[in-house]
A protein has these predicted regions:
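Solvent-exposed, conformationally flexible loop/turn segments
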Residues: 1, 59-62, 109
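Short, surface-exposed ligand- or partner-binding patches at beta-edge/loop junctions that are enriched
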Residues: 74-96
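A short beta-turn/strand-edge loop motif at beta-sheet boundaries
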Residues: 16-20
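Short, solvent-exposed loop/turn segments enriched in Ser/Thr/Gly
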Residues: 1-7, 80-84
């Protein structure tokens, strides 16, 4: 079926609790740090069930997670798909992103399906 995915984890390294509500933003980057085509779709997909947005309280040292999936087989007229070297992830309701090394070959114009942030299990 060509689906791949990963679970990403936010860990609270502060001395105070923090909260999340909703979905992350994301931007795929090439090896030079330039933006690749990226289309973030909220709501999960084939690999990850979306719990929907809920307020997630994370105590100091605690974590929250979200799932991300993509298709790595060319879609429609695509013959190849760009592969990222890293990804910028923006937590819900934030403007500052985190850059994470990640080799992702997202076909379909860089389509990424994401779940809402949820408590880590």
């Amino acid at each position: 079926m060509g689906h791949e995915g990963a679970t990403f984890r936010f860990t609270n390294d502060l001395d105070t609790p923090c909260t999340f509500y909703g979905y992350v933003g994301a931007q795929l980057l090439d090896a030079a740090g330039h933006a690749l085509p990226t289309d973030v779709i909220r709501g999960g997909g084939y690999l990850f069930r979306d719990p929907g947005p809920e307020l997630v309280a994370v105590p100091p040292g605690g974590s929250a997670t979200f799932g991300m999936e993509w298709v790595h087989i060319p879609v429609g007229a695509e013959t190849t798909c760009p592969t990222s070297s890293s990804i910028e992830v923006t937590p819900p309701d934030e403007r500052t992103f985190l850059t994470i090394p990640a080799r992702i070959m997202a076909c379909g114009g860089g389509t990424l399906h994401v779940t809402a942030v949820q408590p880590a299990s």
